[in-house]
Structure formats: structure tokens, C-alpha cells
Amino acid sequence: MPDMKLFSGNSIPKLAKFIANRLYINLGKASVGRFSDGEISVQINENVRGSDVFIIQSTCSPTNDNIMELVVMVDSLRRASAGRITAVIPYFGYARQDRRVRSARVPITAKVVADFLSSIGVDRVLTVDLHAEQIQGFFDVPVDNVFGSLILLEDMLQRELKNPIVVSPDIGGVVRARAIAKLLYDTDMAIIDKRRPRANVSQIMNIIGDVANRDCILVDDMIDTGGTLCKAAEALKERGAKRVFAYATHPVFSGDAPKNLKNSVIDEVVVCDTIPLSENIELLPNVRTLTLSGMLAEAIRRISNEESISAMFEH
């Protein structure tokens, strides 16, 4: 069996370290930095010939820098004769640009990034809760999309919830919310019907379902500016919800997210560590982070040993 090696870019070193600790190995020795003109500099400082290599790198903000850093690391390892290279991308940037809207003259950037990674020598991709599952088909290499939402579910099950109801923040999230509701004591589900006049701005229109005197659990794959989430929470409280908890895998938290969450009526926001939090977010008392290091470490172990990934999620 080839020797497993784990390398990390600069996007999410804390999670990479946690994963390495779970696997009882050290992170690979590599120098990943910048030249004086801003170009990315990578040097692999140990032998990787024939090794089964995993690179941990979220393509979060600064998205373009982190993508290029991943690409240059892949090329460095390929030229150093690594046996197999798996890109572990906990958060896959550009995933929301996965289609053309009404024949607009826009790119499908998720496909562009997938083609880029497939063409430069990545043998496999491991990611978490893709914004759209069809993105797996954009790649010309195998993609394992693991479910971080199950880590969130474990936290929900440990809460002392009173008459809970799972809420989808939009129509597109109904499948995700229904799956969580079924696993959460087969509880009821509500849907928030909203209209979005422009990017990152939404208007709550209607709540489908009775949320009065219930603990509401908003579930989504990511939180960006938090505007949608905070307005959803306000609408739920106006309809008589007792408490509102928000769960999301990816804490993008861009723009006015710190201000929005600080001033929101949400009782607690729970996210995973696929993206590092800014200091402004970390200081908020109503934001808590769960680690995916155990799940990702097990997925990496299974890939390296040629074992089933889907078996991790069979109930």
C-alpha cells in the first residue's frame, strides 16, 4: 500500500492540523508562500515519490488565490512523482455559479474550476456539502461529496428542543431540510418562500407551515452575508416561534455578516470549520463552530485504503 501523505495550503491550516492529528500523522513538509511580486511560491520539502497524497485546501476567500495555490501545489507534487493526488476541498468556491440563468451571457464558473483541477493532475476530489450536487458531474475525475450536515444533525439531537420544526430558508433547500427533519425524530417541516431582487438581498414573502410556539431549526448549506437568515428568523419570531437556531455547513460570512448576526434575533448559529472565521465573527456569542476533522479523516483513510465512502452514511 502506498505511503499516505497529507499536505496543507494556507486557506485552512487549523482544520488540516486537526485532520492530521486524527490520522496520527504529521502534515507534509512544504513551503507555500509568495514571491515579492505576489506570485505563489511552492516547494515540497520531502520525498513523495509513489505516495498517496492528499492536499487540504478550501477555495474560500481570497478564492482566486486559494485556487491557484491548490493548483500550484498539485503541479509541484505531480512533478515530484506523487503516486496519486487527492484534492480535499472542504468548501468548494464558485459552486453557486453552476448554471446559466435565462440564457444570460454568463459563464458556468463551477465547471471552469472543475475543468482546471481535472486537467492539471488531480486524481480525485473530496469535498463537503456541494452547493449543487450536479457539480460532481463537472469533473473528469471521481468526486466524493460527504455530508457535513450529519455533524450538524448530531448537535441538534443533543439539544433540549421543545416541539421542534425544521425550516428551509428557500424552496431550493427543501430536499436538505426534509432529510434533516426525517432524521430529527421525523419532525415537521416549514418552508420560507422569498424573492431575491438582487444578489445577497432577499425579501421574506411567506412562511409555509405553522411555527407558533415551536423551536425552529433553519438549515442551509452555507451562510453568506446572513441577510436571508436574519430576515427569516425575524419572520419566524413574528409568527410566534419560541426559539430560532440556524445550522449551516459553510460559514462564508462575507460583507455585513458580522453586523447582521450581531443584531439578529437568532438564538444561536452553528456552523462547521470548512472556512476559517474572522475575528469579528469569533467574538460573537451566538456563533458556534463544530469540526469536521473526524469525518474528513475517516473519508481520507477510506480513500487511501480503497474502502467505501458511502458506507459512512448508511443508516
Curated annotation (Swiss-Prot):
GO cellular component, one term: cytoplasm
Alphabetized UniProt keyword annotations: ATP-binding, Cytoplasm, Kinase, Magnesium, Metal-binding, Nucleotide biosynthesis, Nucleotide-binding, Transferase
Pfam families in the record: Pribosyl_synth, Pribosyltran_N
EC number: 2.7.6.1
Entry note: cofactor: Binds 2 Mg(2+) ions per subunit.
Residue sites binding Mg(2+) 1 per the record: 131
UniProt xrefs under PROSITE patterns: PRPP_SYNTHASE
Annotated residues for binding of ATP: 37-39, 96-97
An annotated GO BP: 5-phosphoribose 1-diphosphate biosynthetic process
SMART domains to which the protein is assigned, alphabetical: Pribosyltran_N
Residue numbers binding Mg(2+) 2: 170
Cofactor list: Mg(2+)
Superkingdom per UniProt: Bacteria
Reaction(s) catalysed (UniProt annotation): D-ribose 5-phosphate + ATP = 5-phospho-alpha-D-ribose 1-diphosphate + AMP + H(+)
Catalytic machinery residues: 194
Role description: Involved in the biosynthesis of the central metabolite phospho-alpha-D-ribosyl-1-pyrophosphate (PRPP) via the transfer of pyrophosphoryl group from ATP to 1-hydroxyl of ribose-5-phosphate (Rib-5-P).
Oligomer status and interactors: Homohexamer.
Protein name per its UniProtKB record: Ribose-phosphate pyrophosphokinase
Organism, as annotated: Buchnera aphidicola subsp. Acyrthosiphon pisum (strain APS) (Acyrthosiphon pisum symbiotic bacterium)
Taxonomic classification: Bacteria, Pseudomonadati, Pseudomonadota, Gammaproteobacteria, Enterobacterales
